[in-house]
């Protein structure tokens, strides 16, 4: 969909002198049209970029139902950018990171994104969170030609069609690919299992189910869906128990991992649990469950023992991983206190990839150049993610694969190597790439 | 002079004249604003339309609805459904009218049920409605579930651009187009509502609000008047929802939380119950205040999360302060002060 | 069959929580003729206070008592400091005042206590009870919830039916002028009504939170369904609140387990509309609508 501006009008004259006077008076009184209407230079659009700074915008749920957990992601990004800025910035430019709250409400996302793009004049958006929320602004960002990098959501919408949304790039492994990788692992390793699905009632659950059914359609005996923020999930888990599912795959958020574990304990229901990457977070869920042991859950921390999951990033509990060590050091020097969490790690990893793209783009930073860099070089970027990003001219999807892991004693242990795949009928292959190590100072080198 | 005064005394004439003047002023103001301010003006327009409708319902007929967000959802989804393809089946104005009609019908059904109930029971039922409608569209197929429906705003019609250009000398871009639409709709709605409030129907409503038993003895059919007020307010909410879909560009369940209904109610309260000017003022506050407060919070050194939470704190406090200190609302209190001064002089 | 019983028991405990919340609304309605929309955020705040105490002392019961006491104080403070000034004015003013308080408390709690999930311990086992080799889908805490609601119900009925105080409270709410003439200290009664209601509200908060997660929005679904339960039963009747809560809890549990979780809100609306169309004053409205 293209919109044409009709320049012909500029040569016409408005109706009367009185009208002109009024326009003048009102323009003086109100805030006149500002720099937003300026024409980009021939070399490309440098909105938001000066010799000393780059303005980057982000929208996250800082308030409301989605805020617990997600509101800490931008703290991670902020810490990383502060660290980069303390070390001289990128080509001498400091990153000015502006976070706005959208309360996970598309209406608010729309208004704060307007504010970021039209008023604050950001160079790019980074890590804007949520499927329905970002859906509200993706057309606006693309028609305004604002780079929309690393959307914080695993929907395939963010990158499967670069022709439709040439300025939008995904980041994490999409839910469909994750479903496929989990499905294949189950088909290979637990072919007799009666699989029950515990799904969040939205695109997250639906894409996951689609991917799973590519491999274990016949093994699925029950599907239960919950609405986040709704009533108690006892009836959902009871339905899975009634169908005698002995392996439950959960496409749910971390709070519902804790809640489903508590319900299962109440029902004396002990299937093998397999939570997706989004829902597992052993540090968060484990600490939530461990706190109950002060009450009467005797084995709170061990509740998660033996739970399967997937990972596209190292877990913060894996302190021997060099990326975790590097990010932990940065968090200690520039973070906002407390131990590094997986949410903050997520934000830092996005920020790292963004700085990587800025470094690779070079000194002459424009919006067009940044997108060109990601399409041409983004596929070769190495970082904390296990598998490469799928960035190219044909796909803007994020990292392409994950490991199957198991939680043991609060630690995440690898079960498989890195499995990579893509949406649609792409096969799953074991990645041969060796794990990368971070640069010594934690900042991707300039080219 | 007396002739002019007499004509001015006819509410319809007065409202139409004010409407035309307002239209011209609005055209000039919008054309002089930046795209960001235009987007905010669009938000203010749909909030004001919904608040205007709620003013009639709550301020005039004394019924409390905690679920008007549901009717915005009805209007928004109708518009989104008709605008999900690049080639809309109907002209935009017709789509907006269809949205009003659908909200009107749904409002009629709910209104008939609500008219039988007293205060807290209406509140309970409408609160349940505010939660039920978003959940229902999530459940039904064809409405895009959680992601909602994408709204493709039709291109600005050439004749529209021409007219605006002729008057103001400024081009119409897609963002300001929605703002123009919103404010034109707002002016039309407010003229209609203002006339209604001045009419016999309006007086009936006030009588009902102040003393329903006496009103009934005086021969007013309680039920019919209540339903009419309800339907009028839901029609306004439907129009507001339609404009909301156009300005947000998506209609998704998460866009219609219970907070939305409470927000609308607070817009009515902030300005003053029963006054359309108050509704306008209240929606202006709701549009511009959160951003100002949040920015003030971050510049005062609060964390992002804290400054984001600050906006609701401030508007909740203002809401309480208005009720405690100036129950007639800002507009009502100013009017009283003005009348007192004139009385003294 | 097992699924049926599990869903039934789940619905009962869920319903008991709604009933507790509805009882708080009913209490305040009986003693002041006001619907307190800030009930849930007030309970949320007191639950957080309780959690702070539990976390620092390690004693659940101390936290429990402190939370209830905090409710008593908060209720009285809100009545004395805010509601007092709009009493006798239009009903709408009080409603809007409590809605304003709703918004403020919600955000203040997020600022003061943070946005994170916190786990709220329970004093009893969170495992299903074992009876004769069978696992019952109800925890020790679930049983506690049911008993707590029953006790509150009995106390409330006793208060209004058998004590002088209850009579005075009702009289103050129903007709302040007459009550004043009869020597009732109306102001004190209203304060007491708010304070007691807030205690019951705090209890509801503790029952929702126990053995589950606490965050500033954790009472949100109770706001709607607890209110619906109260209205369903007829705001004026404690028995109605309990029945309304249990009916709603069971219905929502079965719809959620056997149909779809997205149909839960529309079911609540459907039940409410159906009941109100037959009995506009709720299930247990025995008094005909008051006429002037």
Protein language model features and the residues they cover:
Chain A
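Short, low-complexity disordered leader/linker segments with a strong preference
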Residues: 1-55, 430-447
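Immediate post-signal peptide segment of exported/extracytoplasmic ligand-binding proteins
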Residues: 38-58, 89-94, 187-193, 364
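Beta-alpha junction/loop-to-helix N-cap segments that form part of ligand/metal-binding clefts
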Residues: 40-44, 68-75, 87-161, 171, ...
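Extracytoplasmic "Venus flytrap"
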Residues: 40-78, 100-107, 129-130, 198-206, ...
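Extracellular/periplasmic Venus flytrap/periplasmic-binding protein
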Residues: 107-111, 155-157, 164-268, 318
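Periplasmic-binding protein-like
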Residues: 116-129, 147-151, 195-199, 244-254, ...
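Extracellular/periplasmic periplasmic-binding protein-like sensory domains
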Residues: 264-348, 440-441
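Segments of small-molecule ligand-sensing domains
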Residues: 333-344, 355-414
């Amino acid at each position: 969909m293209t919109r044409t501006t009709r320049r012909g009008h500029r040569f016409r004259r408005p109706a009367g002198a009185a009208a002109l006077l009024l326009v003048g008076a009102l323009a003086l009184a109100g805030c006149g049209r500002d720099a937003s209407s300026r024409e980009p230079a021939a070399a490309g659009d440098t909105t938001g970029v000066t010799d000393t700074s780059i303005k980057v915008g982000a929208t996250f749920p800082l308030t409301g139902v989605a805020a617990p957990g997600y509101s800490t992601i931008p703290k991670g990004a902020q810490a990383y950018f502060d660290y980069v800025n303390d070390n001289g910035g990128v080509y001498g430019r400091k990153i000015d990171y502006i976070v706005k709250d959208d309360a996970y409400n598309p209406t608010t996302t729309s208004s704060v994104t307007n504010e970021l793009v039209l008023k604050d004049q950001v160079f790019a958006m980074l890590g804007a969170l949520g499927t329905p929320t970002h859906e509200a602004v993706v057309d606006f960002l693309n028609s305004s030609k604002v780079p929309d990098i690393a959307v914080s959501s695993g929907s395939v919408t963010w990158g499967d069609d670069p022709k439709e949304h040439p300025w939008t790039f995904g980041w994490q492994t999409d839910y469909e690919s994750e479903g496929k990788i989990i499905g294949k692992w189950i088909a290979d390793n637990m072919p007799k299992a009666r699989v029950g699905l515990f799904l969040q009632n939205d695109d997250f659950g639906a894409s996951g189910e689609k991917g799973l059914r590519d491999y274990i359609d016949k093994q699925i005996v029950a599907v239960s869906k919950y609405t986040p923020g709704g009533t108690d999930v006892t009836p959902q888990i009871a339905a899975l128990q009634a169908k005698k599912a002995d392996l439950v795959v959960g496409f749910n958020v971390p709070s519902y991992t804790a809640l489903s574990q508590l319900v299962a304990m109440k029902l004396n229901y002990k299937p093998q649990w397999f939570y997706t990457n989004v829902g597992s977070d052993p540090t968060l869920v484990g600490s939530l469950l461990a706190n109950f042991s002060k009450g009467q859950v005797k084995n709170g921390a061990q509740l998660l023992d033996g739970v399967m999951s997937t990972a596209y990033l190292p877990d913060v509990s894996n302190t021997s991983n060099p990326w975790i060590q590097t990010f932990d050091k940065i968090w200690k020097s520039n973070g906002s206190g407390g131990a590094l969490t997986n949410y903050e790690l997520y934000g830092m990893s996005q920020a790292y990839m963004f700085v990587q793209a800025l470094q690779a783009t070079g000194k002459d930073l424009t919006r067009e150049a940044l997108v060109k860099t990601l399409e041409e070089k983004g596929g070769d970027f190495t970082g904390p993610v296990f598998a490469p990003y799928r960035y190219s001219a044909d796909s803007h999807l994020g990292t392409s694969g994950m490991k199957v892991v198991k939680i043991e004693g609060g630690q995440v242990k690898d079960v498989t190597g890195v499995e990579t795949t893509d949406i649609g009928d792409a096969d799953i292959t074991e990645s041969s790439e060796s794990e990368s190590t971070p640069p010594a100072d934690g900042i991707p080198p300039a080219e | 002079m007396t002739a002019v005064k007499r004509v001015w005394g006819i509410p319809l004439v007065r409202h139409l004249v004010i409407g035309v003047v307002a239209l011209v002023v609005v055209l000039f103001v919008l054309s002089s604003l930046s795209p960001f301010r235009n987007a905010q003006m669009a938000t203010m327009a749909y909030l004001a339309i919904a608040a205007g409708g709620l003013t009639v319902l709550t301020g005039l007929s004394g019924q409390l609805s905690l679920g008007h967000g549901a009717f915005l959802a009805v209007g928004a989804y109708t518009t989104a459904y008709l605008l999900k393809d690049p080639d809309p089946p109907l002209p935009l104005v017709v789509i907006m009218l269809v949205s009003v009609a659908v909200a009107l019908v749904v409002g009629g059904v709910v209104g008939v049920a609500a008219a039988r109930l007293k205060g807290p029971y209406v509140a309970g039922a409408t609160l349940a409605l505010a939660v039920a409608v978003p959940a229902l569209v999530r459940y039904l197929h064809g409405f895009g579930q959680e992601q909602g429906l994408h709204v493709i705003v039709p291109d600005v019609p050439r004749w529209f651009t021409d007219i605006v250009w002729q008057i103001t000398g400024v081009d119409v871009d897609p963002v300001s187009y929605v703002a123009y639409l919103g404010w034109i709709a707002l002016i039309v709605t407010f003229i209609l509502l203002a006339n209604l409030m001045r009419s016999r129907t309006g007086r009936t409503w006030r009588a009902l609000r102040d003393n329903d038993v006496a009103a009934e003895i005086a021969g007013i059919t309680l039920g019919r008047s209540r339903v009419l007020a309800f339907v009028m307010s839901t029609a306004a909410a439907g129009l507001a929802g339609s404009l909301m879909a156009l300005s947000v560009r998506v209609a998704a369940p998460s866009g219609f939380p219970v907070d939305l209904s409470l927000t609308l109610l607070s817009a009515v309260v902030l300005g003053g119950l029963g006054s359309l000017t108050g509704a306008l003022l209240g929606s202006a506050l709701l549009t511009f205040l959160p951003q100002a407060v949040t920015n003030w919070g971050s510049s005062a050194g609060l964390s992002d999360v804290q400054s984001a939470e600050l906006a609701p704190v401030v508007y909740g406090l203002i809401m309480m302060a208005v009720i405690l200190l100036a129950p007639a609302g800002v507009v009502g209190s100013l009017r009283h002060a003005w009348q007192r001064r004139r009385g003294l002089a | 069959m097992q699924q049926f019983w599990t869903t039934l028991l789940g619905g009962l405990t869920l319903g008991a929580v709604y009933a507790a919340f509805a009882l708080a609304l009913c209490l305040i309605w009986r003693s002041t003729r006001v619907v307190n929309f800030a009930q849930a955020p007030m309970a949320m705040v007191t639950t957080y206070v309780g959690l702070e105490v539990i976390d620092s002392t390690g004693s659940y019961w101390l936290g429990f008592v402190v939370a209830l006491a905090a409710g008593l104080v908060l209720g009285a403070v809100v009545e004395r400091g805010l509601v007092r000034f709009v009493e006798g004015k239009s009903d709408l003013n009080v409603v809007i005042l409590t809605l304003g308080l709703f918004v403020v408390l919600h955000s203040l709690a997020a600022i003061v206590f943070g946005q994170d999930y916190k786990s709220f311990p329970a004093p009893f086992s969170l495992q299903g009870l074992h009876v004769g080799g069978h696992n019952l889908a109800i925890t020790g805490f679930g049983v506690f919830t049911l008993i707590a609601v029953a006790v509150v119900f009995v106390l409330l009925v006793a208060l209004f039916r058998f004590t002088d105080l209850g009579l005075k409270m009702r009289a103050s709410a129903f007709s302040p002028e007459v009550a004043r003439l009869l020597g009732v200290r109306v102001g004190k009664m209203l304060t007491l009504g708010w304070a007691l209601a807030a205690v019951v509200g705090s209890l509801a908060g503790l029952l929702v939170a126990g053995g589950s997660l606490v965050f500033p929005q954790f009472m949100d679904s109770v706001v709607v369904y607890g209110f619906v339960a109260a209205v369903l039963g007829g705001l004026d009747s404690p028995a109605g609140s309990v029945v309304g809560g249990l009916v709603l809890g069971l219905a929502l549990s079965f719809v959620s387990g056997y149909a779809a979780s997205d149909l839960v809100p529309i079911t609540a609306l459907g039940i409410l509309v159906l009941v109100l169309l037959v009995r506009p004053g709720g299930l247990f409205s025995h008094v005909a609508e008051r006429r002037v």
